[in-house]
Amino acid sequence: KDCKRESNTFPGICITKPPCRKACIREKFTDGHCSKILRRCLCTKPC
């Protein structure tokens, strides 16, 4: 199961995955993606 949390460091609107993923990895998560509706950067890691 993956735990999901909004990135604390990603600025602005999330349009492409790579910069979001990079921010998430810096925050000790394993991956990150953009939310479809609100365009937020969401970080994921195994719980």
From Swiss-Prot:
**Effect of mutating residue 4 to E:** Unperturbed ability for fibril formation and membrane disrupting activity
Q: What is the effect of changing residue 39 to E?
A: Complete loss of oligomerization, fibril formation and of membrane disrupting activity
Provide a GO CC annotation, any one. vacuole
The protein's location, in the record's own words, is:
Vacuole
Q: Which residues bind a 1,2-diacyl-sn-glycero-3-phosphate 1?
A: 36, 39
**Chief location of this protein within or outside the cell:** other
Site, Required for formation of double helix: residue positions? 15, 37
Q: Which UniProt keywords apply?
A: Cytolysis, Disulfide bond, Lipid-binding, Plant defense, Vacuole
Q: Where are the disulfide bridges? A: 3-47, 14-34, 20-41, 24-43
Which terms does the UniProt entry file under GO BP?
A: defense response; killing of cells of another organism
UniProt binding sites for a 1,2-diacyl-sn-glycero-3-phosphate 2: 4, 33
Query: What GO molecular function terms would the record report?
Result: phosphatidic acid binding
What's the short name of a Pfam family annotated to this entry? Gamma-thionin
Share what the entry says about its subunit structure, partners included: In the presence of phosphatidic acid (PA), forms right-handed double helices which tend to bundle into fibrils. Each helix is a repetition of dimers containing 2 bound molecules of PA per dimer. Dimers are arranged orthogonally in a tip-to-tip configuration with 1 molecule of PA located at the dimer contact interface. Association of 2 helices to form a double helix depends on intercalating isoleucine residues Ile-15 and Ile-37. Bundling of double helices into fibrils depends on Arg-26.
Q: What does this protein do?
A: Plant defense peptide. Disrupts membranes containing phosphatidic acid (PA) via a PA-dependent oligomerization process.
Annotated family: Belongs to the DEFL family.
Q: What is this protein called?
A: Defensin NsD7
Give the source species.
Nicotiana suaveolens (Australian tobacco)
